[in-house]
């Protein structure tokens, strides 16, 4: 991902304030609610029968936190996203058979969640920089599919 120095600063500055547990659970939960076909990858998570069940599900929250912790690893290695996400790409491609489009969807949901959490602090330049990052992460995660 090519980010200017200013964009990197905007992304890392905001990311330092993100509550990964809260935002991660919300982002994954929203993905599962808005795109219900993604639930098939989470059969072991128990009750996903309604929006409130999904959003209150402790396994959704825990996995969402894990997802955002990985995102943090990516932000620390913006110049090597493919390397950073190589093992996760392999897992999601070879073992879990996740449609790579889901990575893009989750990235877009994450941008919405961050906008909701940060309000006016999530300025258009911050959003634009985050869109670049989540697109780069989605591409890195889809790398093994090519």
Curated annotation (Swiss-Prot):
The keyword ATP-binding does not apply. One of its GO terms (molecular function) is hemoglobin alpha binding. The modification Phosphoserine is found at residue 44. It holds the Pfam family Globin. Keywords: Acetylation, Heme, Iron, Metal-binding, Oxygen transport, Phosphoprotein, S-nitrosylation, Transport. The modification N6-acetyllysine is found at residues 59, 82, 144. Residues 2-146 form the Globin domain. The modification Phosphothreonine is found at residue 12. Red blood cells. Heme b binds at residues 63, 92. It comes from the Eukaryota. The modification N-acetylvaline is found at residue 1. PANTHER family: HEMOGLOBIN FAMILY MEMBER, HEMOGLOBIN SUBUNIT BETA. Heterotetramer of two alpha chains and two beta chains. Belongs to the globin family. This is Hemoglobin subunit beta. It comes from Blarina brevicauda. The lineage of its organism: Eukaryota, Metazoa, Chordata, Craniata, Vertebrata.
